[in-house]
Regions:
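Positively charged, low-complexity terminal tracts
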Residues: 1-21, 25-98
């Protein structure tokens, strides 16, 4: 399990490394373009939802537990980017087959 650490939020958010690697690419693409967006996920214990406003001016860190980066699924990246560009903001959608 990796961690997303966002200085605008509270506690680090635990996210599986494969998912976190895909989210990292979406975050970096949006922030490179200067596009703030919302990101919603569940707490590590899934007891509540966490909504974050992701903005280029706030520090962001991705911590991975694995030593090797996972293979990126381009179809999943596109689905996540579509979600990030929607009015609801970025939500983790199920990974489609390659």
């Amino acid at each position: 399990m990796g961690k997303l650490i966002y200085k605008g939020g509270g506690q680090p958010i635990e996210i599986e490394d494969r998912t976190l690697a895909h989210l990292r690419l979406v975050f970096m693409t949006k922030l490179r373009r200067g596009e703030p967006f919302s990101f919603a996920t569940h707490s590590p214990m899934a007891t509540h939802r966490v909504d974050l406003w992701i903005h280029p001016s706030l520090p962001l860190q991705f911590h991975f537990t694995g030593s090797r980066p996972p293979r990126i699924n381009q179809r999943w990246m596109e689905a996540l980017m579509d979600s990030a560009n929607s009015s609801d903001g970025l939500r983790v959608v199920p990974e489609p087959r390659y």
